[in-house]
A protein has these predicted regions:
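Substrate-binding cleft of extracellular glycoside hydrolase catalytic domains
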Residues: 72-77, 82-99, 108-197, 205-207
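Flexible, glycine-rich phosphate/dinucleotide-binding loops
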Residues: 125, 154, 221, 243, ...
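Functionally critical loop-and-helix segments that line ligand-binding/catalytic clefts
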Residues: 57-94, 99, 229-287
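Membrane-proximal basic amphipathic "stem/tether" segments
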Residues: 19-22, 46-64
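Hydrophobic membrane-insertion alpha-helices, especially the h-region
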Residues: 26-47
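Catalytic domains of cell-wall/extracellular-matrix polysaccharide-remodeling enzymes
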Residues: 176-248
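ATP-dependent carboxylate-activation loops
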Residues: 104
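N-terminal Lys/Arg-rich, disordered targeting/topogenic segments
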Residues: 1-25
Length: 287
């Protein structure tokens, strides 16, 4: 094949374009490398800090203790998920004076808690007595906030959705609304329960423009909800000795213990893992 010939001007232009593309590609590769190194650096720093504290600088809460089995289970979960993001749950079961919002951490004070989820409403009319104060404290201390509605399976989904919307004013940077479903209805069929849950979700989604997060226990999800809410963010509670909350399902959050001991809180709390980095968690929040 005869080689195509170019004028000097055209050849020079082609050469310049190739150089531009070459240097552009180098810049892209360099940027990717820098981001990867930063991510690796953060992970290594977290790992080194965690293991150093675990062996040489153990934190012991003055009031709270777990059984050896539970302590080892929690320690293993933390060790296996140092690249993920941690948070906690609170409600009226925690007293206001029990929480020192300035310094909240786990893992021998090496893992900061980045988000907090709090119960806002329950059923048709109830609201958590500490919600408003906890909500403001979380914002004041730059924690990512989440509010959940405890769904009462035999009550009206429209009234329950309105109860949540009247009591919760989500803002930019907050997690999407969270629906907590744990109970089986006594006066409704399971089919009717699913229909009602979808009504609640539809009303709340139309208000905020985001699909609610579905929170439930692993076995409840497997037995009643699986296949019905596949396109919703999933928050599973599983307190067993397992590597993930579900062997079969993708999950976004895992509530892995109800016996969490936190530096800065004088009662045990539920602890949660977000299945990703803090950056990706912020992408999940409301605009």
């Amino acid at each position: 094949m005869t080689q195509k010939k170019y004028s000097k001007k055209t050849a020079k232009k082609i050469h310049q374009n190739r150089r531009k593309h070459y240097f552009f590609r180098r810049k892209i590769l360099l940027a990717i490398l820098i981001i990867a190194l930063i991510g690796t650096g953060f992970y290594l720093k977290q790992s080194v800090s965690y293991y150093y504290a675990m062996y040489f600088n153990k934190f012991k809460h003055k009031k709270l203790h777990n059984t050896e089995i539970e302590a080892l289970r929690i320690q293993k979960i933390l060790s296996d998920n140092l690249d993920k993001t941690y948070g906690f749950d609170i409600s009226h079961y925690q007293n206001r004076e029990d929480i020192s919002w300035d310094s909240l951490s786990i893992g021998n004070k090496t893992i900061p808690l980045e988000f907090v989820v709090m119960r806002a409403t329950m059923g048709n009319r109830s609201a958590d007595k500490h919600f408003d104060e906890f909500w403001e404290q979380a914002k004041k201390h730059n924690l990512i906030r989440g509010a959940y509605h405890f769904y009462r399976a035999d009550e009206d989904p429209v009234v329950q959705a309105n109860n949540f919307l009247e009591n919760v004013k989500l803002e930019s940077g907050d997690l999407p609304p969270i629906l907590d479903i744990e109970k089986i209805p006594k006066r409704k069929t399971n089919k009717k329960l699913i229909e009602d849950l979808k009504v609640w979700c539809k009303i709340v989604e139309e208000t905020y423009g985001e699909k609610p997060i579905i929170y439930t226990y692993y076995h409840y999800y497997k037995d009643f909800l699986k296949g019905e809410f596949d396109d919703y963010p999933l928050w599973l509670a599983n307190y067993n000795d397992v590597p993930t909350p579900s062997p079969d399902d993708n999950w976004d959050f895992w509530q892995f213990t109800e016996n969490g001991i936190v530096h800065g809180i004088n009662t045990k709390v539920d602890l949660d893992i977000y299945n990703g980095s803090l950056w990706s968690l912020k992408r999940l929040t409301l605009d």
